[in-house]
């Protein structure tokens, strides 16, 4: 008897990607095969995103394509919170579940495509680290679900609930399993990484027979013992983050912080109801860089938030010039269905939003280009992601570059028979532009 096949479409952020990996791992553990196309699937699971309107539309389109090509579709993920919207467009989907509803998805799969009988998991082995949708050399490590904050532009808590931290022993064991599987870089993700453990009152757990608190610093310290790259994402600048900078300065974890500042005007931050908005971030960034001169800071910002005046925007630009952040993303404000910011007065016109976005990006491009120019002549360690098809070039990243959202280091004139994805290289930086670096190979690192 052939094993049933399940097709899978994964949309959205890295946190949703981890949800997809978990569902796929459970499917494979139970003996289901993963179909490579719609035609070969007994049903299709679509893991959706519902954060902004464009993501909602992409999710609805993906559901429609799966319905058209296959006809038997289970919908999960953040958009699943709005079942009425999904069924209004696609009334014949088999089942709709919410975000991180792993058991609900599996029950729906069991209902419509029963698991194969007499499946022996010891014969059809699933790798210890589970099924991964990322390249073999890096992986996302989700440490918690949900968020306790109620930012006015965000509906994540209504989709994923309040903060629920994973036991630290479970987090560390997963990270160790990833290392054993050959992963060179772990990217720590959640909705609010630096709040990790608050909901458990920093409960004591165990890993390798040693007591470890379910706490941001303690987790980072333990991850730093693994001897692989550890990159922190979605870190809010609470006061206790300062201690983690010491771990970066000691080389225990990558000196890289992804902090979503979102704005710099105190008035706009108050309207956004941002956590930690009262902290003097410029002074703290200065102290962080004194402690750890190699620190790279990435952030995201929103321009055109309801009520944003030209004065507020100028405060943001001046803050940006002083902060000298390394990596920055910017978005124009987009109303999200269900977000309380929609009810704020004085919405900014699309024309003004776009004009401010362009001014913002021009300022940041100059900052980014200047900071990257300083890298020329430096020796850096980079991790190879891929090789270019037509040229002897390795597409790599340094500690300063997260996959997909930051720049690359292009290592030129390599021998493709010697350089492979997942290898660490020692390189010399030879050139730079606004976002990327160019380098020549010094040596392939063996450890």
Swiss-Prot record:
List the catalysed reactions: L-aspartate(89)-[ribosomal protein uS12]-hydrogen + (sulfur carrier)-SH + AH2 + 2 S-adenosyl-L-methionine = 3-methylsulfanyl-L-aspartate(89)-[ribosomal protein uS12]-hydrogen + (sulfur carrier)-H + 5'-deoxyadenosine + L-methionine + A + S-adenosyl-L-homocysteine + 2 H(+)
Q: Where in the cell is it found?
A: Cytoplasm
GO CC annotation: cytosol
Q: Which residue windows are transmembrane per the record?
A: none
Instruction: Give the protein name, as stated in the record.
Output: Ribosomal protein uS12 methylthiotransferase RimO
- UniProt xrefs under Pfam families: Radical_SAM, TRAM_2, UPF0004
Q: Where do the Radical SAM core domain residues begin and end?
A: 133-370
What is the UniProt remark on how the cofactor binds and its stoichiometry?
Binds 2 [4Fe-4S] clusters. One cluster is coordinated with 3 cysteines and an exchangeable S-adenosyl-L-methionine.
Entry's family note:
Belongs to the methylthiotransferase family. RimO subfamily.
Please list the cofactors this protein needs: [4Fe-4S] cluster
Tell me, in a sentence or two, what this protein's role is: Catalyzes the methylthiolation of an aspartic acid residue of ribosomal protein uS12.
Q: What would you give as a GO molecular function for this chain, any one?
A: 4 iron, 4 sulfur cluster binding
Database matches in PROSITE patterns: MTTASE_N, MTTASE_RADICAL, RADICAL_SAM, TRAM
EC identifiers of the protein: 2.8.4.4
| Domain of life from the UniProt record | Bacteria
